[in-house]
Amino acid sequence: MGIRFILMVNKQGQTRLAQYYEWLTLEERRALEGEIVRKCLARNDQQCSFVEHRNYKIVYRRYASLFFMVGVDDDENELAILEFIHLLVETMDKHFGNVCELDIMFHLEKAHFMLEEMVMNGCIVETSKANILSPIQLMDKAH
């Protein structure tokens, strides 16, 4: 397994979306998220987007007011994960039109659905924006 978890966090450190691909208790998740968020938010724009934490490599990127953080195994390619984050943001932009924190908050199920289309059991399985968004567009038409 490559990807262990994906977090979307605002500038104040509030988690807006969390998707885990390994089992952790709620207490372990809260502690892990708190540690990672503090570590990443304390860094400045000139520092590298890769951080080691516990037994994870954290790859993160800031888009507007949201930080996208992905925890991966040591042997995962950091640049590929940065590209994955960019693809996720582009996909959300295409659906929501310049995605922002409120889009995630009010359409959390769609954000999770996009992630579920892209990542299965910690492995990236879909990179086509059209294929990722197709089921969501069908659901939107049905409502």
UniProtKB/Swiss-Prot annotation:
One Pfam family from the record = Clat_adaptor_s
Which SUPFAM superfamilies did the record assign? Answer: SNARE-like (SSF64356)
Q: Which cysteines are joined by disulfide bonds?
A: none
One annotated GO biological process: protein transport
According to its UniProt record, where is this protein located? Golgi apparatus, trans-Golgi network; Membrane, Coated pit
Instruction: Please tell me whether the keyword Protein transport is annotated for this protein.
Output: yes
Q: Is Protein transport a UniProt keyword of this protein?
A: yes
- InterPro entries, alphabetically? AP_complex_ssu (IPR016635), AP_mu_sigma_su (IPR022775), Longin-like_dom_sf (IPR011012)
List the keywords (alphabetical): Coated pit, Golgi apparatus, Membrane, Protein transport, Transport
- GO cellular-component terms in the record? AP-4 adaptor complex; clathrin-coated pit; trans-Golgi network
For this chain, the family text in UniProt reads: Belongs to the adaptor complexes small subunit family.
Describe its function: Subunit of novel type of clathrin- or non-clathrin-associated protein coat involved in targeting proteins from the trans-Golgi network (TGN) to the endosomal-lysosomal system.
Assembly information from the UniProt record: Adaptor protein complex 4 (AP-4) is a heterotetramer composed of two large adaptins (epsilon-type subunit and beta-type subunit), a medium adaptin (mu-type subunit) and a small adaptin (sigma-type subunit). Interacts with EHD2.
Q: Which named protein is this?
A: AP-4 complex subunit sigma
Q: Which organism is it from?
A: Arabidopsis thaliana (Mouse-ear cress)
